[in-house]
């Protein structure tokens, strides 16, 4: 069953002059279609200006299509009467956790969403504890978010969304402001949410190595979907990805160069271990 379905979605920003008159329009998304099944881990890859973040904001009705339709669990994103339910169904996590965390204490911040939903107090306590345990943040429940690392803050942001019991979490470049350790921390948490909790994950990123465990990758450029497929299918197209200003993981690039020089290894290598195993077979 589809949890997210986009049909020929186009979005245009209106440009106005200093008097407020319309000067023209910029097309940020151009006829994008996408079908995300419940329980999938999907990654949307693209360089800055590709339209990926603009598209992400359509997935819980922050933005509405100029043309086309976005369905969230069968609900039209343009249906004002369903807006509350849509945002419960598809939670959103943004790039900077400091802009999303509002509580003075971690557990208070995680409780904010369920409180606004009108959840009974005893259930809020259960949801907060459950979300913090799932994200490995229970020991920080009484701490100030200001004392946490970037990766820990982002996990608190994700816990706040998780406490609202969404079917899907959309994450718009959640690791962009983190160091490598923080990035790994967040991606590990997302994989666990998907594999253990069966929550649909839609990850928006320009870091290709974060997408290796996805069920499917969509590559965007200039507002359009240029490629889609499994990580192995996508990573095979090294030159094309570089044209879209995406940085192919070093191990995949190394394997690609070896292959070009005639080394008999598989077409697409995704990890150090895969490359080591392939080279061992040649000895």
Give residue ranges: language-model regions.
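Helix-to-loop junction immediately C-terminal to a conserved catalytic motif
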Residues: 60
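Catalytic Walker B motif of ABC-type/P-loop ATPase nucleotide-binding domains
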Residues: 169-172
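Conserved ABC ATPase signature
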Residues: 144-148, 152
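The feature captures the beta-strand-to-loop junction immediately N-terminal to the Walker
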Residues: 45-47
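Conserved ABC ATPase "signature" region
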Residues: 122-140
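Conserved ABC transporter NBD signature motif
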Residues: 68-78, 86
């Amino acid at each position: 069953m589809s949890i997210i379905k986009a049909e020929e979605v186009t979005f245009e920003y209106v440009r106005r002059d200093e008097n407020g008159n319309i000067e023209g329009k910029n097309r940020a998304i151009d006829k994008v279609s996408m079908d995300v099944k419940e329980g999938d881990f999907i990654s949307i890859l693209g360089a800055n200006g590709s339209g990926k973040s603009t598209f992400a904001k359509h997935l819980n009705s922050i933005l509405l299509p100029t043309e086309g339709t976005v369905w969230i669990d069968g609900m039209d994103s343009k249906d004002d009467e369903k807006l509350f339910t849509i945002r419960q169904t598809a939670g959103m996590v943004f790039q900077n956790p400091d802009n999303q965390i509002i509580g003075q204490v971690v557990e208070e911040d995680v409780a904010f969403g369920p409180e606004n939903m009108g959840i009974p107090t005893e259930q809020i306590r259960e949801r907060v504890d459950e979300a913090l345990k799932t994200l490995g943040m229970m020991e920080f429940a009484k701490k100030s978010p200001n004392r946490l690392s970037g990766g820990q803050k982002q996990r608190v942001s994700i816990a706040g969304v998780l406490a609202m019991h969404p079917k899907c979490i959309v994450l718009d470049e959640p690791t962009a402001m983190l160091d490598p350790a923080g990035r790994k921390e967040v991606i590990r948490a997302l994989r666990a949410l998907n594999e253990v909790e069966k929550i649909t994950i839609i990850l928006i990123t320009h870091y290709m190595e974060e997408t290796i465990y996805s069920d499917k990758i969509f590559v965007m450029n200039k507002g359009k979907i240029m490629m889609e497929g499994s990580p192995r299918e996508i990573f095979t197209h090294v030159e094309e990805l570089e044209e879209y200003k995406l940085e192919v993981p070093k191990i995949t690039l190394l394997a690609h160069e070896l292959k070009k020089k005639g080394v008999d290894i598989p077409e697409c290598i995704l990890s150090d271990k895969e490359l080591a195993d392939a080279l061992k077979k040649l000895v």
